[in-house]
UniProtKB/Swiss-Prot annotation:
Domain annotation Cupin type-1: ranges: 65-216
Protein name per Swiss-Prot or TrEMBL: Germin-like protein subfamily 1 member 8
Subunit structure: Oligomer (believed to be a pentamer but probably hexamer).
Taxonomic classification: Eukaryota, Viridiplantae, Streptophyta, Embryophyta, Tracheophyta
Glycosylated sites: N80
Organism of this sequence: Arabidopsis thaliana
UniProt function note: May play a role in plant defense. Probably has no oxalate oxidase activity even if the active site is conserved.
MF terms (GO), sorted A to Z: manganese ion binding
Keyword Manganese on entry: yes
Amino acid sequence: MTIKSLSFLAALSLFALTLPLVIASDPSPLQDFCVGVNTPADGVFVNGKFCKDPRIVFADDFFFSSLNRPGNTNNAVGSNVTTVNVNNLGGLNTLGISLVRIDYAPNGQNPPHTHPRATEILVVQQGTLLVGFISSNQDGNRLFAKTLNVGDVFVFPEGLIHFQFNLGGTPAVAIAALSSQNAGVITIANTIFGSKPDVDPNVLARAFQMDVNAVRNLQARF
């Protein structure tokens, strides 16, 4: 076998070994449960959290209340997201799922954002919502939008920019599940115009084809 062939086989083997790492999401658990704790005492570090000693795990480690309480929507965007993830429900650790309640004021919105680690499935509990997501550059940045009423369900694919807007004159409520114990969130406007420190306004002016002073005004808002 030639040196060239050996080099090709070595590169192919390396690619095969790294491919599972590239496509992986939350790893599957190798135990019944791993209740997340923030201290290492009597714990094992798994998936970003220390596991609570199974001998002192109780039902409350898998319990969260208060999703029946409306969130405060008195803010600039007119919405509030109440999150149930591994940070406030330790029993979710390694289970690859989390939940949110979203409250919308009349004409409020959950502004364009993305979850870098999760797909989201949403069901409307109250009101009427305009929802949608935008596909990637490779797909031509197509908008997929739908008006949802009570009981309707919509899916937002992992990593894609999406939004919800309350079309009604009364408050709206939705519940959403995400395919990660900690999905993460990147709100587009806050990230671009509210970064710390600011992105050079000349960069954003060129990217958005805007006047530099208009960019500075937007940055001042965030």
